[in-house]
Amino acid sequence: MTRAVITGWGKCRPPLSLTNADLERLVETSDDWIADRTGIVERGMCHMETTDMAEVAARHALAAAGLEPTDLDLIIMCTLTPEVSCPSGACSLQERLGAVNAAAFDLNAACSGFVYGSVTAASMIAAGAKRTVLVVGVEKLHFLIDYRDRNTCVLFGDGAGAAVYQASDDPDVPDAGAPGVLGTDLGADGVAGSTMVVPTLGSRGELSSFRDPEHSRLHFEGQAVFKIAVRGMIDSVCRALDRAGLTADDVDLVVPHQANERIVRAAATRLGLTEDQVMLNIATHGNTSAASIPMALNDALDTARVRPGDTVVFTAFGGGVTWGSVVLRWGDRVERLGTSDAALDPVDMTVDELLARNREFFAPLHD
């Protein structure tokens, strides 16, 4: 049986940070309030563009896999914040990398994007349609955020993460012990779609929609999302495990969407998982939507949280609403085959200067 195995991983965490202390100066809040309710201490802010972050993460992932861009069959960019509507971010990334043999498309499932992209990659590999797929989760969320709205501004950060999936069909390895994706689950419920909305960037608005602050900012109903997300991720993980012929007792590590520490811990507790079985990096990254799982996976591998042969679970819940989970058995290698010096350009501004345009644009909503 042909399975999709992760052979490379990488991330791009922007060098600028928006700390809780910074937010105390921008909005009526406090470090204690934010940390207690979200688990976040700081979040990355990008001074460049979405594709710049995606390229950095992708080059690190390709180096880790020991591959060249020309080895790729497909690029899937998971994002709700592309630079432009057309060409797709994936096509722009293909050009940047020189991945001339790769098909490319964008996928938008909000915070569930990387899981949706991973299931798509694994399915295409299992079907024999592709053999080497780059999945990138990337978001530049700060430009959608009203930094006087404490319900949203304390949560979100910018960043990118990437994973290379390759076909593994070694005839000498029995299917029962072979590495790769073992089970998946995807779902959606459009009835609850109003809990997270980005009104602009769509055909519904007028051409002048970017001049309308109310219809340009991210709308997020935190309490409603909390209730749906905990139940949704639990059910999704259980379905994916069942399809893999496993139970929660077989799980070595869960790498969840870093939505909110309370959501993650509530879901983990109900699944019977210990703290050591759950990867969290939200304290220093914030909620980076589609980028959060691959960024957390990168950190898990860098800190020896993933061991050869481990059963690893990705799970996410996002706007749409969407949800999904992936169960996979890790291969023998947890070290990079190579490294890359790819990085964003040096920062030439402060975080206050970066966010000045946001604050000016959304100011009429608070007069």
Model-derived features: where do they sit?
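Short beta-strand segments
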Residues: T7, C78, N108, V133-E139, ...
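Glycine/charged-rich beta-loop-alpha catalytic/anionic-binding loops adjacent to active sites
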Residues: G39-V41, L72-I76, E95-N108, L144-R148, ...
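Conserved beta-ketoacyl condensing-enzyme motif
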Residues: I6, C46-A109, V115, A248-V264
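Flexible, glycine-rich active-site loops centered on histidine and acidic residues
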Residues: A126-A160
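Claisen-condensing/thiolase-fold acyl-transfer catalytic domains that form or cleave C-C bonds
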Residues: E55-A58, T81-P82, V100, A109-A126, ...
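Acidic-glycine-rich active-site phosphate/pyrophosphate-binding loop
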Residues: R25-W33, S85-G98, V135-L141, S203-R211, ...
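Condensing-enzyme catalytic core mediating Claisen C-C bond formation in acyl metabolism
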Residues: M1-H47, D149-K227, R231, D235, ...
